[in-house]
Amino acid sequence: MADSTLRGYLKSYVISQQGIDNALLHADQTWQSESSLRLMWQGGSTSTSSINYAWELHYQVNPIFSNQLVEAVNFQSTPPANYRLTDIDPLLIDEARRPVLQNLDRLNIQLQFDQGDLTIGRQAITFGSARIINPTDVFLPYNVTALNTEYRIGVDAIRYQKPLGQLGELDMGFIFGKDGHPDSSAAFIHGKANLAGTDLEFAAMRYANQTLLGAGMQSALGSLGFWLETAVVNGDRRYWRTSTGIDYAFTESMFGMVEYHYNGAGAADSRHYLSTAQTSAYQVGGVFLLGQHYLIPSLSFQATPLTTLGLQAIVNLKDKSSFWSISATHNVLDDLYLGLGYYHFIGKPPVANQTTPFEPGYLAAEYGTSPDAVYAQLSYYF
C-alpha cells in the first residue's frame, strides 16, 4: 500500500542594499524582492515486507525583481551546474531585472532493505561535525550570505546507507556531474560511530581530480559542547581545512557558540583573493571564504516563546574585515513567520591598479567591497 503527501512553503523577501562606489564596483542603492515557492511531494510504501520504498519530488520557483542589474552581495541559493547529470533550464523567464528562476531540487526513490537504504536520484548529501564551516562538506554548501538555506541543494547520486549498531552508519555513493563525465563526477565513503559518548566521523572522497580525506568528532567538555573537523585535499594543490569550536547554553533561552576555521585553500595576502577564487577549491570543492584564519561567534536568544533573536559574525583574522548578521524571527500564526535582518560588512575598500588603470585592482579586505543590507521576510508553510 502506498501513501503520499503534498506540502511546501511560500517565502517572500524584500531587500534593500546600500549603494557602492569603489575601485572594483559601482552600483546605486538596490531594492530587490524575491519570492520562493517550494512544492514537496513525497510518499512511499506502508507494507511490512522486507523491501519498502520512499520517494520525493521537490520543485522550487523564484520570481525576482530588482531595480539594478548589479548585485554586490549574493543573497540567492541558486544551485550551480556542478554535480547534476542534467537539469531543467534554471531560467524560467529570462528578463534582466525580473527573472524567474526554477529548480528541480529533489527527484529520487529510496529502496529500504533490512540491511540498509539505497537512494537513487536527486537528493541532499551533506557531511561534517562542525557547526558553521564544514571542511568535509564539498557538495554545494551554501554561501554565508544566502538567505534561504532551509533545504540543502540537491545533487544527482546513487547512495547506500547501512546502519552499524544503534549510533553508527556506513554511507557510500557516486555523484554524477554534468553528462556523467568522470572529471565532473564524484565518489565518497563516509562513516559514523560513537565511542564512549563521543561521536566520530571519517570521510574519503574523489571529485574533479581531487582526493579528500577527513575526520571529525563531537563530544562534551563538562557543560560545553565541543567539535573538531579536519580535511586534507590533494589534487591541483595540497591544502588543509579545519574547524573547531565550543557551544554553551547560558540560560534556557540563550545559546552561544564560537568556531575557529582554518582555510588552507585561501590566500595569505588579500592581493591574491580574486585569483584564488578561480581555483578548483572554489569552483568544485565547496570553499567560499577567501582568507585563511577566521573566528565565527554566534548567539541566539529566545526573547519570547514566539520570538527568536540571532547574532553572528565571521571575522577574517588576517585582513581584519568582518561580516555581521543580526536577525529576528516572530511566529505570527501556527504556519506564518515574520523575519527581519541586517547585514553589516566591515573592511578596507579595494585598491585601484595604479600601474595599469585598464586592469582591475585588488581586494584590500575580504568584506571591504560589500555594502550593508537590510531585509524583511514573510514565510508561510502548508
Where do the language-model regions lie?
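Residue-level signature of outer-membrane beta-barrel architecture
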Residues: 4, 41-45, 111-113, 162-164, ...
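Residues that define the transmembrane beta-barrel architecture of outer-membrane proteins
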Residues: 27-37, 100-105, 112, 152-156, ...
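Transmembrane beta-strand segments of Gram-negative outer membrane beta-barrel proteins
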Residues: 2-21, 25, 51-53, 168
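Detector for outer-membrane/organellar transmembrane beta-barrel domains
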Residues: 218-314
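Outer membrane beta-barrel
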Residues: 49-169, 347
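Repeated loop/turn-to-beta-strand initiation elements of outer-membrane beta-barrel proteins
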Residues: 4-6, 47-51, 115-118, 167-170, ...
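Outer-membrane beta-barrel "beta-signal"
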Residues: 295, 301, 330, 336-337, ...
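Transmembrane beta-barrel strands of outer-membrane/channel proteins
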Residues: 8-16, 53-59, 120-122, 172-176, ...
